[in-house]
From Swiss-Prot:
Pfam families, sorted: Ribosomal_L19 (PF01245)
Alphabetical list of SUPFAM superfamilies matching this protein: Translation proteins SH3-like domain
Transmembrane segments: none
Organism of provenance: Caldanaerobacter subterraneus subsp. tengcongensis (strain DSM 15242 / JCM 11007 / NBRC 100824 / MB4) (Thermoanaerobacter tengcongensis)
The keyword Transmembrane appears for this protein: no
A GO term for molecular function: structural constituent of ribosome
InterPro entries xref list: Ribosomal_bL19, Ribosomal_bL19_CS, Ribosomal_bL19_sf, Translation_prot_SH3-like_sf
Highest taxon above the source species: Bacteria
Family of the protein in this entry: Belongs to the bacterial ribosomal protein bL19 family.
Gene: rplS
Protein name: Large ribosomal subunit protein bL19
Taxonomic path: Bacteria, Bacillati, Bacillota, Clostridia, Thermoanaerobacterales
Gene3D superfamilies named in the record: 2.30.30.790
Length: 115
């Protein structure tokens, strides 16, 4: 049991930007295409965070050309370059699945957190 925790702790990322559900983020993710490697940004609203430790994931949703696109990222993945928080959102739910039913601009409307 301690061996698993030791291996897990050395693979955990230390420099993760703190963010919450409802925040609008831009995720920079390394994509490997053949022999090339490039960084692909994905911007949207965080609708879910789940898991803990090395298995923690988060899901980002955006509307692209009228179609909702969701992408789930492992938080401690070596391919995750950085996470940039664009706007802080104020929500009262841990999972924002209700955004899936919304159409148009309502799908991206979340109250902004005043700091």
């Amino acid at each position: 049991m301690d061996l698993i925790k030791a291996v897990e702790s050395e693979q955990l990322k230390k420099d993760i930007t703190p963010f919450n559900v409802g925040d609008t983020v831009r995720v920079y993710y390394k994509v490997i295409e053949g022999d090339r490697e490039r960084i692909q940004p994905f911007e949207g609203i965080v609708i879910k965070r789940s898991g803990s430790g090395l298995r923690e994931t988060f899901t980002v949703r955006r509307v692209s050309y009228g179609v909702g696109v969701e992408r789930t990222f492992p938080l401690h993945s070596p391919r995750l370059e950085k996470i940039e928080v664009i706007r802080r959102g104020k929500v009262r739910r841990a999972k924002l699945y209700y955004l899936r039913k919304r159409v148009g601009k309502a799908a991206t409307k979340i109250k902004e957190l005043m700091e």
